[in-house]
Amino acid sequence: YVDGYPGESCFNCVMPGMSEIIVITSGKGGVGKTTTAVNIAASIGYYGYRVLLVDADPQGNATSGFGIQKRTVDRSTYEVLLGQCSARDAILTTPFKGVEVIPSSMALAAAELELADMRDRVMRLKEELVRVKGEYDFVLIDCPPSLGMVTLNALSACDSLIIPIQCEYYALEGLSQLVTTVRQVKRLYNPGIEIEGVLLTMYDGRLNLTL
């Protein structure tokens, strides 16, 4: 608790002029990934920090969650990844204090195939985010529910990741695959990447697996 508010001390470790890129990913859907990303972004913004949320999920629920109508989006994460616009040109303001968004669009679903034949296909998001990173205290990336090319771009660009995991058996199986992918990214593309932690979601104390 700081000044009567729970959680504020979690962000006091950020030094002035420093910023951190954090990926929210699980490698599968339905585990509360987007809910986690939206709530962390809104909470950090509430405490006075500058936050950029990059919606890299074609479903675009994080975009909608911050009051942006997807049908009105002209520039999205898709255009940024394909080099059709800069990250700065895709940024939109939101009604939420301190939070700006690079929105998603349904076109992002096609990015997996289009990126496959491109040069530096895994580093394209990083190349754009380094140009705007210094304008924010935190950059959060909400990933798609898969370990494809878009997620690899996010992992290659980030400093750390948070892994939401549902308290059930098959989620544990998916965690192993994600950790293996992170190790490969660390070896090949991003030696500084670290796992911030695993966040248990949809907790049910009646289940043995939860305990």
Question: Whereabouts are the PLM-identified features?
Answer:
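P-loop NTP-binding core
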Residues: 1-211
